[in-house]
């Protein structure tokens, strides 16, 4: 099946979905209605672009016909030639858009994410920068209409973040934030620096798709679950009832502790969400490392310690090293307006995948 047959088939299916979604029998079946609604939403942009493409093809045909029937009228012929020229340029643009829209979708793109940020090299300054990154992602989430929930956090003495785990929920969260995993470097003058010297610090970010229990089954025998009393500042026990939960995945020694909630069950549920995502991510990374060709077709090397971006405060500059993008908009980006960076990463990734398909 060539690309045009594929697009026509997709348009036929889209029209069929429209009829199904207005069928009372389907509407009464909540599960099926939701599945079909999702399929319809996922094909909507491709079908709309294909219909615009067909309009362009018709414009080319009309312009060519007008030239033939101009009867030598130079004004009509010139107008038709100009329209033909513009339509041919638009045709090429739409063909590229359609190729990108037909690229195989990442099955995780529609998922919520678990976001982890840690202060790394640089002590207090790294922890403060980790807090800046948390604020940036939280503001970006708000601008997208997503829900941002801090699930677990530990702070240092100067208000910085040692480690934070957050759940980001909404439409296509993973598709936009999946490129954020890696080491983020900051260059700035710390508030404690009396000589005005620029210091370099690092925070690491990990983005994992939320994994439902039906998608990834962890054998209960592989888990050790400990229950203990939650502790507050200074280490004192804050609950008379043991509500804090520690879960260890024994085969990988991945550990999650949760004490943010007031009940043991809520802490356990949140801890399971995190450990399921971490264990799935652990084995996904192993599989990815074994597939060199696949890794080359994605942004970066896949190494979680890879430096992906530098934030230079004195120059108000952000540089994404994977795609060579430099923007003099650090203040804007840290305020949560990340669209320009994310759009560039998405476009680069799509271009790389297209080149791989065309080889």
Curated annotation (Swiss-Prot):
Species of the source: Streptococcus uberis (strain ATCC BAA-854 / 0140J)
Compositional bias of kind Basic and acidic residues: 293-308
The protein's name in its UniProt record: Peptide chain release factor 1
Protein biosynthesis recorded as keyword: yes
InterPro entries per the UniProt record, alphabetical: PCRF, Pep_chain_release_fac_I, Pep_chain_release_fac_I_sf, Prokaryotic/Mito_RF, RF-1
HAMAP family reported for this sequence: Rel_fac_1 (MF_00093)
Keyword terms of this UniProt record: Cytoplasm, Methylation, Protein biosynthesis
Disordered as annotated region, ranges: 288-308
Superkingdom of this protein's organism: Bacteria
Molecular-function GO terms, alphabetical: translation release factor activity, codon specific
Chain positions found as N5-methylglutamine: 236
GO cellular component: cytoplasm
Main localisation: cytoplasm
Compartment annotation: Cytoplasm
Family of this protein: Belongs to the prokaryotic/mitochondrial release factor family.
Described function: Peptide chain release factor 1 directs the termination of translation in response to the peptide chain termination codons UAG and UAA.
Description of post-translational modifications: Methylated by PrmC. Methylation increases the termination efficiency of RF1.
């Amino acid at each position: 099946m060539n690309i045009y047959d594929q697009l026509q088939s997709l348009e036929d299916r889209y029209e069929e979905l429209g009829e199904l979604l207005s069928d009372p029998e389907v509407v009464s079946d909540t599960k099926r209605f939701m599945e079909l609604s999702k399929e319809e939403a996922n094909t909507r942009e491709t079908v709309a672009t294909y219909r615009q493409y067909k309009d362009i093809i018709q414009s080319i045909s009309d312009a060519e016909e007008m030239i033939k029937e101009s009867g030598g009228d130079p004004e009509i012929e010139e107008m038709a030639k100009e329209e033909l020229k513009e339509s041919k340029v638009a045709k090429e643009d739409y063909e590229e858009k359609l190729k990108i829209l037909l690229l195989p979708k990442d099955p995780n793109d529609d998922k919520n994410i678990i976001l982890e940020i840690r202060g790394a090299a640089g002590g207090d300054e790294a922890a403060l920068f980790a807090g800046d990154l948390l604020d940036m992602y939280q503001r970006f989430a708000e601008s997208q209409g997503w829900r941002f929930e801090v699930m677990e956090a530990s702070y240092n003495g100067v208000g910085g973040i040692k480690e934070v785990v957050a759940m980001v929920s909404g439409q296509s969260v993973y598709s936009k934030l999946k490129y954020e995993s890696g080491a983020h470097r900051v260059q700035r003058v710390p508030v404690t620096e009396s000589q005005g010297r620029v210091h370099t610090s690092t925070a690491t970010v990990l983005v994992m798709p939320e994994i439902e229990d039906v998608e990834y089954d962890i054998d209960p025998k592989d888990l050790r679950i400990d229950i203990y009393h939650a502790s507050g500042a200074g280490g004192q026990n804050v609950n008379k009832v043991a509500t804090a939960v520690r879960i260890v995945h024994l085969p990988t020694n991945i550990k999650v502790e949760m004490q943010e909630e007031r009940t043991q069950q809520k802490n356990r549920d949140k801890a399971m969400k995190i450990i399921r995502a971490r264990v799935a991510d652990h084995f996904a990374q192993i599989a990815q490392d074994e597939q060199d060709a696949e890794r080359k077709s994605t942004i970066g090397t896949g190494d979680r310690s890879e430096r992906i971006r530098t934030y230079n405060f004195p120059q108000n500059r952000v540089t994404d090293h994977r795609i060579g993008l430099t923007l003099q908009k650090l203040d804007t980006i840290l305020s949560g307006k990340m669209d320009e960076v994310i759009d560039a990463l998405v476009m680069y990734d799509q271009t790389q995948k297209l080149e791989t398909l065309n080889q």
